[in-house]
Amino acid sequence: MSDLMSDLVSEAPLRLAVIIGSVREGRFGPVVARWFAEQAQQHGAFTVDVIDLADTPLPLELPPVPPALEPDMVRPDGMAGLTRRLGAADAVVVVTPEYNRSFPASLKAAVDWHYTQWQAKPVGFVGYSGGSGGILAMEQLRQVFGELHAHTLRDVVSFPRYYLLFDQDGTLKEPEGPAGAAKVMLDRLLWWGSVLRDARRERPFAAQL
């Protein structure tokens, strides 16, 4: 580990929100999220909060006034916990499947009901699907989070044909490659998360609408 990374790790841990983007019955997201959360905990620089969108009612109907114009808006019952946890995060990792070359509606609803909670924070992606490993969903999410003034990371973790990669108990059959990719992304999250956390403390982010 470089001296810079050692210094960053020695600082106060970054609060990392790991979001399970799918709420579909029979989804595989919790298995992937659990694996990634373990990687983040072993990294040593993060406190990890796994956010399962299945635990929060996410209406697809958006408010008449968008959150960008009314950040402190009253949100639907049951969403307060999600809003608080997103706001507290210093960095975010989205675990997403790929449905019809895109990401789930549940994830889009969670994103669109919030605005300031994403600003000036790094966002990483862990994707899983059939042949593409969620790459198409992750590329679309880059555009969405860029619009919300988040910084998306170049490095991702991808699980193509995920159903062949994990055992019945959710253990990766060959963990070395994915673990290496996760470490690269977590190192990037640590750098960006630390720098942007300091920046938000010194000069709160103000987007020009």
Model region roles, listed by residue range:
Residues 1-109, 172-183, 187-190, 196-209:
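N-terminal beta1-alpha1-beta2 submodule of the flavodoxin-like/Rossmannoid cofactor-binding fold
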Residues 12-18, 122, 160-169:
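A short small-residue
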Residues 34-35, 111, 140-143:
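Short, solvent-exposed amphipathic alpha-helical segments in soluble enzyme
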Residues 40-45, 116-117, 149-150:
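Short helix-capping segments at alpha-helix termini
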Residues 49-62, 148-169:
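Mobile beta-alpha loop/short-helix "lid" or hinge segments that flank ligand
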Residues 66, 112-115, 146-150, 194:
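A generic structural signal for secondary-structure junctions
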Residues 107-119:
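A short, gly/pro- and small-residue-rich
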Residues 119-163, 176-181:
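Short, glycine-/small-residue-rich phosphate/pyrophosphate-handling segment
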